[in-house]
UniProtKB/Swiss-Prot annotation:
Family (UniProt): Belongs to the SspH family.
Reported induction: Expressed only in the forespore compartment of sporulating cells.
Protein name: Small, acid-soluble spore protein H 1
Lineage, uppermost ranks: Bacteria, Bacillati, Bacillota, Bacilli, Bacillales
Keyword Nucleus applies: no
Highest taxon, organism lineage: Bacteria
Pfam families listed in its UniProt record: SspH (PF08141)
Length: 59
């Protein structure tokens, strides 16, 4: 995924289907400079992590 698209999804305030390693995630924040996204897993909201934006897939 492109960094700008990830940032738009994070700021939209709506649920957009995004996958990371085959699991549904929510993008909380995007660091454009580092090209990293703070995500959490839909089925495990307590599991937050920072991941490279390029590894996210919009469905």
């Amino acid at each position: 995924m492109e960094t700008l698209r990830a940032k738009r999804i994070a700021e939209a305030g709506e649920v957009v289907p995004v996958m990371y390693e085959g699991k549904s995630v929510i993008i909380q924040h995007v660091d454009e400079e580092q090209e990293m996204a703070r995500i959490y897993f839909v089925d495990e909201p307590e599991r937050e992590q920072d991941v490279p934006v390029r590894l996210l897939e919009e469905r």
